[in-house]
């Protein structure tokens, strides 16, 4: 079984990309429902507040995202979203029977801006949590950032820069994001090996082609 945790930015700066985000996410879900193997999905939306809309739902049963759930407002409480999700999933695994703990856990973090609104978690706290889960349990984290230096921000979270990508926060960039995310998830679900560093090459190529600067 694979544990999939999506941390999605729904802050006000995502305005205008709601339909693209919803469509990309649902297309990715549709592809993953057809893949072999069991998976459970958690989806966390963040702005000023944190909202969990899927809590470890079997991939076949995850409902599509709608505009009633995904709408933009507020600031960017990214640390609280990531820290809260790690704490919750970690506790579930801690108290589960060994045979019920997923073999693989993958967090997919997407943001179009820097942290500016968290109240419960700090960079140091979240970095410690991420490093602990990676080292002890082999959890994997990918970080997709727009309008920021994604590699530098990922490092502050304890995520290796090979697992971070800058993307263009527009219709084409968002669609490509979810295509690549789906491919990365397929790779993780199909193999016991860690995700290869070339998971993001299509996003990197698009970012460079369209004038992105690191």
Label every PLM stretch briefly.
Residues 1-214:
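Acidic, low-complexity intrinsically disordered regions
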């Amino acid at each position: 079984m694979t544990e999939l945790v999506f941390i999605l930015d729904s802050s006000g700066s995502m305005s205008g990309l709601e339909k693209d985000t919803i469509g990309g996410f649902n297309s990715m879900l549709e592809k993953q429902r057809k893949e072999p193997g069991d998976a459970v999905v958690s989806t966390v939306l963040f702005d000023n507040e944190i909202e969990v809309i899927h809590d470890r739902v079997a991939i076949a049963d995850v409902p599509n995202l709608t505009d009633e759930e995904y709408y933009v407002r507020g600031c960017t409480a990214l640390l609280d979203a990531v820290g809260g999700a790690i704490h919750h999933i970690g506790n579930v695994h801690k108290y589960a029977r060994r045979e019920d703990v997923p073999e693989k856990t993958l967090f997919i973090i997407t943001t179009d801006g820097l942290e500016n609104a968290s109240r419960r978690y700090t960079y140091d706290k979240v970095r410690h949590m991420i490093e602990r889960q990676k080292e002890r349990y082999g959890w994997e984290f990918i970080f997709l950032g727009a309008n920021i230096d994604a590699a530098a921000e990922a490092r502050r979270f304890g995520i290796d820069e090979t697992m971070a990508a800058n993307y263009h926060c527009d219709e084409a960039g968002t669609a490509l994001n979810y295509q690549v995310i789906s491919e990365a998830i397929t790779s993780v679900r199909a193999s016991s090996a860690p995700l290869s560093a070339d998971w993001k090459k299509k996003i990197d190529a698009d970012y460079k082609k369209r004038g992105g600067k690191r």
